[in-house]
Amino acid sequence: PNVKMKDSGVEWIGEVPEKWEAVKISHIGKLTKANGGSKQDNVDSGISCIRYGDLYTTHEYIIRKSRSYIEEGKLDEYTAIQYGDALFAASGETFEDIGRSAVNLLKEDACCGGDVIVLKPSKDIDPLFLGYALDSIPSKYQKALMGRGYTVVHIYTEQLRDLIVAVPPSFEQKTIGIALDRQTARIDLIIEKTQRSIDLLRERRSALITAAVTGQIDLRETI
């Protein structure tokens, strides 16, 4: 960037613009361990419920739509979440993936299941920016170092408090969040179209092999 830079003081973040600050997430919000029941509580519709497994399979950076729901009568057994809250998966299979996170942008009532750590950020933190910052490469590197365990990897609130992110002024957070949202959406669309082309080419490849080895086409003249 064409701005004056400074050393963040954090090796894996490097230099940041002069007006940015590298801070522990415990300084920008409150972290708590969530409580919640099992997947057996899931129903087809009801209160949106984000489970730790959803953070690995469904939600990348941002939670825009729930895939799990519970009955309203079960809500007291779960941890309520609000718009802008960040959710971290507290357990996983690998150090590289531990602490996978996403920020809740659901505007309706919602909750989360167990094995989730919730960050309730201060009001001057933009949700979109936070979502991308918490699961960026520097953040993933730190979370991997914080992981504990072997067969199952865990990350705990006490370690996660020390996760450091680079935070710009509020107006820059909003601008960066919106820009990232638009540009990543374009990239995702290109990836989707490319994947469809790859899938089609694989189908044609398989069909060619099948036709050739069953005598349906003669490839001798192509040699």
Predicted segments, located by residue:
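Amphipathic alpha-helical coiled-coil/heptad-repeat segments
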Residues: 1-4, 167-223
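Non-catalytic DNA-recognition/assembly elements of restriction-modification systems
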Residues: 4-35, 162, 166-170, 174, ...
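Short coil/turn segments at secondary-structure boundaries
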Residues: 5-7, 38-45, 65, 145-147
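A short glycine-rich beta-alpha junction/loop motif
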Residues: 8, 109-117, 148-175
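Sequence-specific dsDNA recognition surfaces
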Residues: 26-39, 53-86
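A short beta-sheet element
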Residues: 51, 73-137, 149, 156
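Short, small-residue-rich loop/turn micro-motifs
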Residues: 52-56, 105, 180, 223
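Periplasmic-binding protein-like
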Residues: 139-142
